[in-house]
């Protein structure tokens, strides 16, 4: 059984898709053991609680430095014996210290075809606004392993979709 930890910051639609995928058997032999939010009012925490998944809040402002925040996240995941970490709308950048114990064990979904519209500053609606402003005919999503360099980790898969006009 793969023990999954999910890091969230917002509404949790990606988290809900993962929960539903596990519940339906589409994602086999896996369980979400812990959901951590860096935002105390994230609706993703409600989604996790409704699914009987343990939650906790670890906010960046609780710590003197980003490195201390990274260590707290990693220690919490290690204590829960997490095998794989999924970023599901997690709006914080993880530093090198986080990856000491989780190298090649952290995955993210980016709302564009990396390397386009990726890297620092490209997240959420900003990505989609940039795609539209550039007049792109095609966009998509990328799943990649997370590294200390933003959106630079090895690609796992990509899916392209046409941009509809209007």
Language-model segment annotations:
Residues 1-43:
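N-terminal Rossmann-like dinucleotide-binding module
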Residues 10, 35, 48, 85, ...:
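A residue-level signal for conserved active-site and pocket-lining positions in enzyme catalytic cores
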Residues 15, 44-45, 70, 124, ...:
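A general structural signal for well-ordered alpha-helical segments in protein cores
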Residues 16-20, 46, 71-78:
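Amphipathic, non-transmembrane alpha-helical secondary structure
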Residues 29-68:
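Short, surface-exposed acidic-centric catalytic microdomains
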Residues 61-82:
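Glycine/small-residue-rich loop that forms an oxyanion/phosphate-binding "nest" at active or ligand-binding sites
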Residues 84, 88-166:
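Donor/substrate-binding cores of folate-linked one-carbon enzymes
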